[in-house]
Amino acid sequence: MTLLQIDFPSHGPWGEELTKMASALAHHLNNTPGMVWKIWTENSRSGDCGGVYLFTDESSANDFLKEHLPRLDSMGIKDVRAKVLDVNESLSHITRAPIAAPVAKTA
């Protein structure tokens, strides 16, 4: 399992407004090969937005990143920080991490 962390500075939208704006993208991301899930993150107080993604393998995470960074750039999103990290599954199971979920599928 591989974790991808992405964050970037943002002036919004936040909350429900972001949900309305990004809903189509969220549904599109469900078709991402190897993606198990994505947690959407935002902090209007600090002006940060992004997500945490779980992938079945590092290759899938890197392939997604190659596709997603240009998409973010086309949306005017700059200064994107991204990290690809291995998941320690043994320790993560002890702390109840949701890493045994099936790969995301479109409804």
Kindly label every feature range from the protein language model.
Residues 1-48, 58-66, 78-107:
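Short S/T/G/P-rich N-terminal loop/turn motif that feeds into the first structured element of a domain
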Residues 71-76:
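Short arginine-rich
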Residues 50-54:
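A short, exposed loop/beta-hairpin motif centered on an aromatic-Gly-Thr core
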